[in-house]
Amino acid sequence: VKTRSVLESVSPYNPPRLREEISVDHGSERYVKLTMNELSFGPLPEARAAIVETLSRAGRYPDRDATPLREAIARANPGLSPDNVVVGNGSSETLVDLMQILERPGEVVIPWPSFPFYVSAARVVGLNARKVTLDGHHRVDLDAMLAAVTDETRAIIVCNPNNPSGTYLPLAEVRRFAEALPEGVLVILDEAYYDFVDDPAYAGSHGLVLQSENVVSTRTFSKVHGLAGFRVGYGLAPRRLADLVWSTHVPFSVNQAGQAAAAASMGQPEAIAGRSRLMKRERERVQDAFGAAGLEYVPSHTNFVMVGAKPRLFEKTGVLVREGEALGYPVGWSRVTIGGPEENDRLLAALG
């Protein structure tokens, strides 16, 4: 069988493996999993009810166009219409769909450390990934990314807030950056952690999408909405780019339970904002404890924190965290998901 030789050197995205047991003396309690930036609360009650309601239709294909969901997303982003919204099996699929529409060969410029999936996704669709190091404050370095643009550049991904550093860029900086780029370069704003940032200077990227021909935003229902297991993400894009994405998109990739749950969750903005506030309080508690223990950490605006400690430190109280080297950070760093209050109590018990 003739296959694409480039795939021989592509490593698949490798999320942390689940461990049913860890070698620590922690009685009969199960471990606490704080590795993947999930929300321990799960779906809102309205989303749960919507999921149950779809069971009677489980033998039918879902709405290919996800029309009610796209309408709900458009309503939440004033000025955009459902024609500006694409959906995917998680925002990861939307990222791949966006890369699929780009001319090849070419490059995608990405920040680093950042979401490792960018590298494998680019390679799989036939693009190279050029990494640009974060600045001294662990932020995406827009000046350095602009300097990295060449005639081969097809897209630039700005993870904002950035995973795994947890830092963000104000919208004004992103706007200036996008305006300075050649028109033929696509700007992909990966905003998976959008809902956790409460700074007014951050919000409003949908307006930038509306005013541009080369800016798109991707978001997900896997984080603050608590729907990671249902795999629903979306993109906001100029109409021409949205149409191209639909032309490459795998039909029916977003199941009907996920569509219904996501639409129901979008209809509860106050509840979602309340979850974000709780995460902020818990994040500040965790960061304060890290500081009091003398641990270096990166001040975060998301539901995770990068801390200068090895995962083994937290395993002694039955807590699993993500090793930093898997995400581009040096050995000796960990990314810690902010859990619920009781989970964070277990996490902080490791500090003594």
Model-derived regions: residue spans:
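N-terminal small-domain helix-loop-helix segment of the aminotransferase-like
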Residues: 2-90, 97
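Short beta-strands and strand-loop turn motifs
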Residues: 33, 131-133, 155-161, 187-191, ...
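PLP-dependent aminotransferase class I/II
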Residues: 44, 214-291, 295-297
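PLP-dependent enzyme catalytic core of the Aspartate aminotransferase-like
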Residues: 79, 172, 326-352
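PLP-dependent aminotransferase-like
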Residues: 100-158
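Active-site pre-lysine segment of PLP-dependent enzymes
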Residues: 123, 130, 140-152, 164-187, ...
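Conserved PLP-binding catalytic core of the aspartate aminotransferase-like
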Residues: 279-280, 284-318, 324, 334
